[in-house]
Curated annotation (Swiss-Prot):
Name listed for the protein in its UniProt record: UPF0260 protein RHECIAT_CH0001358
Family indicated by similarity: Belongs to the UPF0260 family.
NCBIfam families documented for this protein: PRK05170.1-5, PRK05170.2-5
Pfam short name (any one): CxxCxxCC
Superkingdom, natural source: Bacteria
Organism field: Rhizobium etli (strain CIAT 652)
SS bond partners: none
Amino acid sequence: MNDLPFWKSKTLAEMTAPEWESLCDGCGLCCLNKLEEWDSGDIYFTSVSCKLLDGESCRCSSYENRWDFVPDCVQLTKENVPDIAWLPPTCGYRLINEGRDLYWWHPLVSGDPETVHAAGISARGRTISETEIDIEDLEDYVVDWPLTVGEEKDEEEA
């Protein structure tokens, strides 16, 4: 019998639907609006969230019906995760796809959905809804913290 947790013993393709869904740590970073530079293809995160992101829970407020309200919402699938370069470096889907383990604060490891927030990984308290800004000003909200959350601080900074 295998005593390893499923994320250590299965590939993304082998996971059941409930296992797949549980890989989401609830950080909300994938629900931030992003800008793509046309000539280079570079992706830039903004602090502007999808109108459906609940800023406190960092979960979609209409997950099952999100495409009714946000037709271009990107669904993470076993097939497309390897090709989505903008997934944050702490994303459970990205980590498992890269053969890495989940961090201590991931709810599957900690047993507590609040640890992702307590560890400062999530978007909680850092965003503004797209309904509250002029979308023409989106570039004014470019941030790098979604790509640096979870990085070890230098001793001088700590």
